[in-house]
Protein backbone atom coordinates (compact mmCIF):
# COMPACT_ATOMS: atom_id res chain seq x y z
CA UNK A 1 0.00 0.00 0.00
CA UNK A 2 2.61 2.59 1.08
CA UNK A 3 5.20 1.27 -1.32
CA UNK A 4 2.74 1.84 -4.15
CA UNK A 5 2.03 5.39 -2.94
CA UNK A 6 5.71 6.26 -2.54
CA UNK A 7 6.98 4.43 -5.59
CA UNK A 8 9.62 2.49 -3.64
CA UNK A 9 9.79 -0.38 -1.17
CA UNK A 10 9.08 0.83 2.38
CA UNK A 11 11.12 -0.91 5.06
CA UNK A 12 9.94 -2.01 8.48
CA UNK A 13 12.70 0.17 9.91
CA UNK A 14 11.25 3.27 8.20
CA UNK A 15 7.80 2.45 9.55
CA UNK A 16 9.08 1.73 13.06
CA UNK A 17 10.90 5.07 13.11
CA UNK A 18 7.65 6.81 12.18
CA UNK A 19 9.12 8.18 8.95
CA UNK A 20 5.81 7.86 7.13
CA UNK A 21 3.34 8.75 9.89
CA UNK A 22 1.67 11.36 7.70
CA UNK A 23 0.84 8.56 5.28
CA UNK A 24 0.09 5.80 7.81
CA UNK A 25 -2.23 7.82 10.08
CA UNK A 26 -5.19 7.81 7.67
CA UNK A 27 -4.84 4.07 6.93
CA UNK A 28 -7.29 1.70 8.57
CA UNK A 29 -6.47 -1.99 8.58
CA UNK A 30 -9.15 -4.54 9.32
CA UNK A 31 -9.68 -8.26 9.72
CA UNK A 32 -11.98 -10.86 11.17
CA UNK A 33 -10.54 -12.77 14.11
CA UNK A 34 -11.52 -14.44 17.33
CA UNK A 35 -8.28 -13.49 19.01
CA UNK A 36 -4.63 -13.84 18.14
CA UNK A 37 -4.58 -12.66 14.52
CA UNK A 38 -6.76 -9.66 15.34
CA UNK A 39 -4.61 -8.77 18.30
CA UNK A 40 -1.48 -8.94 16.14
CA UNK A 41 -3.05 -6.80 13.41
CA UNK A 42 -4.13 -4.26 16.04
CA UNK A 43 -0.67 -4.18 17.62
CA UNK A 44 0.97 -3.72 14.23
CA UNK A 45 -1.43 -0.91 13.35
CA UNK A 46 -0.73 0.85 16.65
CA UNK A 47 3.01 0.41 16.21
CA UNK A 48 2.97 1.89 12.71
CA UNK A 49 0.45 4.65 13.43
CA UNK A 50 -2.58 3.19 11.65
CA UNK A 51 -6.12 2.58 12.82
CA UNK A 52 -7.45 -0.96 13.24
CA UNK A 53 -10.96 -2.36 13.10
CA UNK A 54 -11.29 -6.00 14.10
CA UNK A 55 -14.51 -7.94 13.54
CA UNK A 56 -14.96 -10.69 16.10
CA UNK A 57 -17.50 -13.49 15.66
CA UNK A 58 -20.38 -13.75 18.11
CA UNK A 59 -18.88 -16.67 20.03
CA UNK A 60 -15.61 -14.85 20.80
CA UNK A 61 -14.81 -14.81 24.50
CA UNK A 62 -15.06 -11.35 26.05
CA UNK A 63 -11.49 -11.61 27.39
CA UNK A 64 -10.18 -12.18 23.86
CA UNK A 65 -12.13 -9.20 22.51
CA UNK A 66 -10.77 -7.06 25.37
CA UNK A 67 -7.22 -8.20 24.55
CA UNK A 68 -7.72 -6.98 20.98
CA UNK A 69 -9.12 -3.68 22.27
CA UNK A 70 -6.11 -3.32 24.58
CA UNK A 71 -3.97 -2.97 21.45
CA UNK A 72 -5.97 0.09 20.42
CA UNK A 73 -8.34 -1.48 17.91
CA UNK A 74 -12.00 -0.78 17.48
CA UNK A 75 -13.71 -4.14 18.00
CA UNK A 76 -16.89 -4.82 16.06
CA UNK A 77 -18.76 -7.74 17.58
CA UNK A 78 -20.42 -9.67 14.78
CA UNK A 79 -23.50 -11.72 15.62
CA UNK A 80 -22.63 -14.47 13.15
CA UNK A 81 -19.85 -16.98 12.62
CA UNK A 82 -16.20 -16.37 11.78
CA UNK A 83 -16.98 -16.86 8.07
CA UNK A 84 -19.79 -14.30 8.32
CA UNK A 85 -17.39 -11.83 9.95
CA UNK A 86 -14.83 -12.42 7.16
CA UNK A 87 -17.45 -11.63 4.52
CA UNK A 88 -18.68 -8.53 6.34
CA UNK A 89 -15.24 -7.09 7.03
CA UNK A 90 -14.33 -7.57 3.36
CA UNK A 91 -17.47 -5.74 2.21
CA UNK A 92 -17.12 -2.92 4.73
CA UNK A 93 -13.40 -2.54 4.03
CA UNK A 94 -14.09 -2.21 0.31
CA UNK A 95 -16.77 0.42 0.97
CA UNK A 96 -14.64 2.35 3.49
CA UNK A 97 -11.28 2.06 1.73
CA UNK A 98 -9.72 -0.03 4.50
CA UNK A 99 -6.91 -2.53 3.97
CA UNK A 100 -7.87 -6.09 4.94
CA UNK A 101 -5.05 -8.03 6.62
CA UNK A 102 -6.25 -11.63 6.60
CA UNK A 103 -4.69 -15.06 6.48
CA UNK A 104 -7.88 -16.28 4.82
CA UNK A 105 -7.97 -15.81 1.05
CA UNK A 106 -10.76 -15.59 -1.50
CA UNK A 107 -10.76 -15.08 -5.27
CA UNK A 108 -8.97 -11.82 -6.03
CA UNK A 109 -7.55 -11.51 -2.52
CA UNK A 110 -4.47 -13.71 -2.29
CA UNK A 111 -1.40 -11.46 -1.93
CA UNK A 112 -1.85 -10.29 1.65
CA UNK A 113 -2.81 -13.76 2.99
CA UNK A 114 0.24 -15.18 1.23
CA UNK A 115 2.43 -12.59 2.94
CA UNK A 116 0.81 -13.27 6.33
CA UNK A 117 1.36 -17.00 5.94
CA UNK A 118 4.96 -16.43 4.89
CA UNK A 119 5.37 -14.53 8.14
CA UNK A 120 4.00 -17.52 10.05
CA UNK A 121 6.87 -19.64 8.73
CA UNK A 122 9.27 -17.62 10.91
CA UNK A 123 8.06 -19.59 13.94
CA UNK A 124 8.81 -22.91 12.26
CA UNK A 125 12.19 -21.66 11.06
CA UNK A 126 13.14 -20.47 14.55
CA UNK A 127 12.04 -23.75 16.14
CA UNK A 128 14.03 -25.74 13.59
CA UNK A 129 17.10 -23.51 14.10
CA UNK A 130 16.90 -24.10 17.85
CA UNK A 131 16.64 -27.87 17.36
CA UNK A 132 19.71 -27.81 15.11
CA UNK A 133 21.63 -25.61 17.59
CA UNK A 134 20.82 -28.08 20.37
CA UNK A 135 21.74 -31.02 18.13
CA UNK A 136 18.25 -32.34 18.79
CA UNK A 137 16.78 -35.02 16.54
CA UNK A 138 14.56 -33.91 13.68
CA UNK A 139 10.91 -33.71 14.68
CA UNK A 140 8.79 -36.72 13.84
CA UNK A 141 5.49 -34.99 14.65
CA UNK A 142 4.34 -31.39 14.84
CA UNK A 143 1.42 -30.31 16.99
CA UNK A 144 0.17 -26.79 16.42
CA UNK A 145 -3.02 -24.89 17.20
CA UNK A 146 -5.63 -25.01 14.48
CA UNK A 147 -7.53 -21.71 14.41
CA UNK A 148 -8.60 -21.20 10.81
CA UNK A 149 -5.60 -23.20 9.64
CA UNK A 150 -3.17 -20.51 8.50
CA UNK A 151 -0.43 -21.21 11.04
CA UNK A 152 -0.79 -24.97 10.62
CA UNK A 153 -0.70 -24.76 6.81
CA UNK A 154 2.29 -22.40 6.81
CA UNK A 155 4.19 -24.62 9.25
CA UNK A 156 3.48 -27.79 7.27
CA UNK A 157 4.46 -26.09 4.02
CA UNK A 158 7.69 -24.73 5.50
CA UNK A 159 8.71 -28.09 6.96
CA UNK A 160 7.83 -29.93 3.74
CA UNK A 161 10.12 -27.59 1.78
CA UNK A 162 12.88 -27.51 4.39
CA UNK A 163 12.90 -31.21 5.28
CA UNK A 164 11.68 -32.90 2.07
CA UNK A 165 13.36 -36.23 2.85
CA UNK A 166 12.58 -36.27 6.56
CA UNK A 167 9.22 -34.54 6.78
CA UNK A 168 7.41 -34.82 10.14
CA UNK A 169 3.78 -35.91 10.21
Region spans (language model):
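Internal hydrophobic scaffold segments of catalytic domains
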Residues: 1, 68, 167-169
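Small/polar-residue-rich loop-to-helix segments that shape phosphate-bearing ligand pockets
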Residues: 53-141
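Short, structurally constrained coil/turn elements
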Residues: 23, 94, 163-165
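Acidic, glycine-rich loop-and-beta core segments that form the ion-binding/anion-interacting portion
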Residues: 138-140, 147-148, 153-169
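Glycine-rich oxoanion-binding loops at beta->alpha junctions
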Residues: 1-29, 111-132
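A structural micro-motif
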Residues: 27, 50, 73, 98, ...
Amino acid sequence: HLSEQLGHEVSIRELARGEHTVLTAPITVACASSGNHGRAVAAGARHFGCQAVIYVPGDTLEARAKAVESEGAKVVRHSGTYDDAVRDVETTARDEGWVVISDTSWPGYEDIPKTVMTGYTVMAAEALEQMIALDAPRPTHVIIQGGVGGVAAATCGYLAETLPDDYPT
